[in-house]
Amino acid sequence: MKNFIQSFLFLAVFVPCKFHAQIEISKEKEIKNTESIADTTPKKQRPERKNVDGSTEVFFSSAWSNSYRKLIPNEDFLPKELGIRADEAPLKIWSYGVGFRSYVHKHIVFEGGLSLLRNGESYSFKGEDSTFTSKSIYTYVSVPIRLQYVIGDQIRFFAGGSFFPEIINRFKETSEWTNSKNETKSIVSKDKQALNSMVFSAGLNAGVQAKLGKYMSVFVMPEYRWQLTSSYTKLNYYKHFARVFSVNFGLIYQL
C-alpha cells in the first residue's frame, strides 16, 4: 500500500510538470519562428526625393521671340543711307531647343544644348492705291552655353548669362505687294551669299523652375539676346546686329 501511494504521488507531480515544460518550450519555438519570419520580411520604404546637387537634367524648350535689329551703315566699305529700311519693324517668331543642365554646385548650373534660333524684321507700307510688305527671317543652328545661379528647392529661381555661337542655316525674305489694279504679286528670296556663315551673340536671362514630381519640372525663362558680330559680310552696305527678347518655356527631366 505504501508503494502504491508513492507511485501515485510521483505520477501526480512529475507528469504534469513535464507536460507543462513541453508546452512552454513549444511556445518559445513558435515565438522565435514568428520573429524570424518578421525579420526576413522586406519592409516597404518611402522613396527618397532625389537630391539635385551634382545631378544632370535634360530639357526641351520653345521660345516666343520679339525680334528686331540694329542696322548701321558699313563705314568700312561703302556706307549707304538706310532709306526705307529705317522704317522696318520687329518680327514675332518662334525658336526651339534641346539640351542638358548640370549642377556643378548647389547653386551653380552649367547648361549646354542645340537650338534652332530665328530672328528677323518686317516692313509694311500702305499707299492710296498700293501696298507693300516684306518679312526677313534668319535661321541659325546654335550651341547655346549658359551659366546660372540657382536658389530654392521645389520652386527654384535662377539668373545668369549666356553665349551663342551660331551657324547660318537658312535665310528667307518674302515680299508681297498690290498695285492700283488690285493685283497681288509676291517674291521669295533665299540667297545667303550676303550673310556671314557664323555669328556670335550674348545674352542675359532669369526665370523660375517648378517641380511636378520626383523627376519632372517645368520652367519659364525670359531672355534678352544681342548679336555681337554682323550678320552681313564685310562687302555689304550695312552692318546688321540682331536684338531679340524671348520667353523660353519647356519641360525638364532629372536623370
Give the role of each language-model region.
Residues 192-195, 199-255:
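Predominantly the C-terminal beta-signal and adjacent terminal strand-loop region
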Residues 62, 96-104, 114-116, 143-149, ...:
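Residues on the lipid-exposed face of transmembrane beta-strands in outer-membrane beta-barrel proteins
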Residues 42-49, 66, 104-106, 147-153, ...:
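Outer-membrane beta-barrel proteins
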Residues 22-95, 99-101:
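Short glycine/proline- and aromatic-enriched beta-strand/turn motifs that initiate or cap beta-hairpins
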Residues 1-27, 155, 248-255:
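Bacterial Sec-dependent N-terminal signal peptides
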Residues 107-110, 154-157, 214-218:
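Repeated loop/turn-to-beta-strand initiation elements of outer-membrane beta-barrel proteins
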Residues 91-95, 138-143, 156, 199-203, ...:
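Transmembrane beta-barrel architecture of outer-membrane proteins
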